[in-house]
């Protein structure tokens, strides 16, 4: 499953909001430095979709706020 994700780093609280078009807006506490925001994003998405962190891959947008995420599900 692929999801478009808009990341908002340096937020006061962690939050995942699903948009009408099926994309996600994810608020992260971590700054976008040394991959910390990406690590936090993967951890949050793994918890939301109940999959191991190793099943989540950032396909594009590694250094961008707009990302394409691949989530491997066991379905």
UniProtKB/Swiss-Prot annotation:
UniProt region (Disordered), positions on chain = 1-32
Give a Pfam family name. Answer: DUF167
Q: Which GO terms describe its cellular component?
A: cytoplasm
Instruction: Report the superkingdom from the record.
Output: Bacteria
Instruction: Kindly give the InterPro entries that the UniProt entry links to this protein.
Output: DUF167 (IPR003746), YggU-like_sf (IPR036591)
Q: Which segments cross the bilayer?
A: none
What family does this chain come from, according to its entry?
Answer: Belongs to the UPF0235 family.
Name the UniProt record assigns to this protein: UPF0235 protein asl3196
> What is the organism field in this record?
Nostoc sp. (strain PCC 7120 / SAG 25.82 / UTEX 2576)
Record lineage: Bacteria, Bacillati, Cyanobacteriota, Cyanophyceae, Nostocales
